[in-house]
Amino acid sequence: MKVYILSILLFFSISSFSQTKSVRELALELSIRDLKMSELVNITNDKFSDSIDKAKFIYYWIGFNIKYDYKLLEPKSTLREKQNAYSYNFYPGQIFVKKMAVCYGYSKLYEWFMNKLGIESTIISGFIRDERNHYVELDSDSEFSHAWNAIKLNGKWRLVDSTWGTSLNEGVADFYFDMPPERAIISHYPKNSTWQLLKKPLSLKEFNNSKFINPIWFKIGYSDIPQMKMDSNYYYFVFKNNPNEDWLVNLMYSVDNKDFYNLREVKTIIQDEYTILRFYKSIIPKKTFFKVNLYKSIDNIDYSLIHSDVINFKM
């Protein structure tokens, strides 16, 4: 009887949530409650009828409640010790109680909830690149191995990374739910190319030659992936204008990917809805690394560096 009464109280408590709250806000409000896994499944089904909302709700709940287990990154004295420390990541129930995981554990827990909610899901294994590691080398980049999910909604596979969705920055967290394949491949390289979900999957070489772009580029208003074009005399770095005109793009180059320098004699051309940075090919070495920094106007007078290493690529 006590269990029945508690279930009724929990139902009415959850039902009292404002109908105007977003899925994210509901997940945040619910994160302070001590729930069983089955209760969270029931609440999700009671609160949402749309599968996309269910998948997003669990994504946010995991982001708010499961912390990354950085201790597992510390060196272990033996392989057995490392395996024992890592083993809980294979068991969703242990992850749920422990409230900690590494990437495989995040994807395993997310997969468990999707299965309980009747949403087809799979775990994708592969590699990631970020600000620390712009280029993936399969033989030496084991520390950048990663796991994420694909879920099938309305007959379409969608990419979800609940590990990277733990960011408290709403814009960054949103980026990793239902990632468009052409944006997911910026940072996520699956071992099975099928899970790139691209019409023409990239080889590892093509992946490493493509641009690494921090999601902040899209969050602050840029909408496309910049392109480097050329003719006999010039390079042209081309991107769509940002509706927020306070931002300024700074393109730098390096021969060793360590020391970067500002380009000389850059001409900025505004053409229709695009910005073009034009510079002489003759000043660029044959093998060159580029990076983009973002400056923002302060009081419409001076520009301050706000985000560095936002885009990295090589030629």
Segments (PLM) and residue ranges:
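Bacterial Sec-dependent N-terminal signal peptides
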Residues: 1-21
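A generic secondary-structure signal for well-formed alpha-helical elements
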Residues: 12, 62, 66, 70, ...
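Secondary-structure boundary elements
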Residues: 20-102, 112
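Gly/Ser-rich catalytic serine loop of serine hydrolases
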Residues: 103-107
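Hydrophobic/aromatic-rich core segments of domains that either
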Residues: 108-184
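Alpha-helical and coiled-coil interaction segments, frequently adjacent to or embedded
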Residues: 168-315
